[in-house]
């Protein structure tokens, strides 16, 4: 079993399988589910009950092809977040950088400690997974660090990040990660603006933004930028034991 995985359950006749994966939070993420068909709901429920018997809080994406939302609801799970894919023209939000914070291209911040601090701003957000140093080194996963940006506080610590990928005229980013104590500020939109402005200089015209665990206020703010949610997948959390 891979290091991030802790346990797995297989249904009879290969009707379904789920595994539990570690996350940066207390919950374990459920991966897999039950094959589509007349017994899907029954098999999915049985697998989830077995996993829940561990007593550990669990989270799972509602997916009609594997884990239908109505099965999660029947078991008492509650929607606690969502994955959203936003699309639209590159936005230019009017914003300001909070006092004591500076924003610079990721290419100018190669130090792994600083990058790790910035990446950890996602740690409490439902849907985000564990990352290794190999995932955050300059250029990891073909990210364009000329375009992606990082925010540093007065002590030089990473307090925000927006990683970026360019493909022709399309910029793809993850929703900016912000240190909890700064989430009430305009830093999220400041990072987004800096990244979009840099992408525009390289010919980008359109944005694809992937967001996990954003708050309702952040979701509304993205709607107000003229972006359209083309994919929304609810994320459920098991009820406390």
Q: What kind of feature is each model-predicted range?
A:
Residues 200-241:
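Short hairpin/turn module used for nucleic-acid contact or packing/dimerization
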Residues 24, 35-102, 219, 232-241:
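Acyl-donor-binding surface of acyltransferase catalytic domains
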Residues 11-13, 22-23, 88, 152-154, ...:
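Active-site beta-strand termini and strand-to-loop segments that position acidic
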Residues 1-52, 158-180:
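Conserved donor-binding loop and adjoining core beta-sheet/short helix segment
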Residues 94-171:
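Flexible, substrate/cofactor-facing loop regions flanked by secondary structure
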Residues 53-64, 199-211:
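Conserved GNAT acetyl-CoA-binding A-motif
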Residues 37-53, 184-201, 224:
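Conserved acetyl-CoA-binding loop-helix of GNAT-fold acetyltransferases
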Residues 15-16, 76, 80-82, 159-160, ...:
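A structural microfeature
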